[in-house]
Amino acid sequence: MIHLPPAALEAHVAILGKTGSGKTYRAKGYVEDLLREGRRVVILDPTDAWWGLRSNAAGDGPGFPITVFGGSHADVPINEHAGEALGELLGREPINAIISLDGMGRGEMHRFAERFLEALYRVNQQPVYLILDEADEFAPQSGERGTERLLGATDRIVRRGRKKGFRVWMISQRPAVLNKNVLTQANTLIAMRLPASQDRKAIEAWIKGQADEAQAGRAAR
């Protein structure tokens, strides 16, 4: 695994790649590095993919000190109405957390997330790495009806959150459907296999904002 330099960790990061490309494996490796260094991490996990961080690699002993809220491996069960209270709690307390939204309907997940992100932004004042797995769920490009408030909450954290301690990592298998105003705020982008031309164009657009047009075209091929 390629190790990120320290400067890259102090920035917003996008990790992009199709299903099976290894993006989640790589992202977990980077998050493990953060936890080893004592950084505070909060993970929004729509698919219950991250709970294993609390176990060791063999699965027979303790791993990292991280609390799982929600999902089938929950330390603390949650429902769609818990978003604001949990956001306030994690904004006040130095707790590492995985928030599994698996088992919620899509509308329930969106309602939970919008209130959680609003409360976390309002209360938090300390450094925290906010990991958005399947980030296009929280910042959709399409402007899907009913997601306006959620997109606004995500966009506000990404654009304005650095002064309040936020470092946001966005993980997505479809950068084409991840909101471009949010994606362009990433300072570091890690792109893995992306066979769809629309997804490669999204990468090219990001690179154009960071480099010259010739470099962007070469990198997106």
What are the residue ranges of the model-derived segments?
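Conserved ATPase-coupling elements of RecA-like P-loop NTPase cores
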Residues: 53-54, 105-111, 124, 136-152, ...
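Switch/coupling segment of Walker-type NTPase motor domains
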Residues: 2-8, 30-115
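Conserved ATP-driven motor cores of ASCE-family P-loop NTPases powering translocation/secretion/packaging/pilus
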Residues: 19-21, 31-32, 54-59, 80, ...
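Substrate-engagement module of ASCE P-loop NTPases
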Residues: 116-125, 150-169, 211
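Conserved H-loop
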Residues: 46, 133, 166, 173-174
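Hydrophobic positions on the alpha1 helix immediately C-terminal to the Walker A/P-loop
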Residues: 26
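The Walker A (P-loop) glycine that initiates the GxxxxGKT/S ATP-binding motif of P-loop NTPases
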Residues: 17, 134
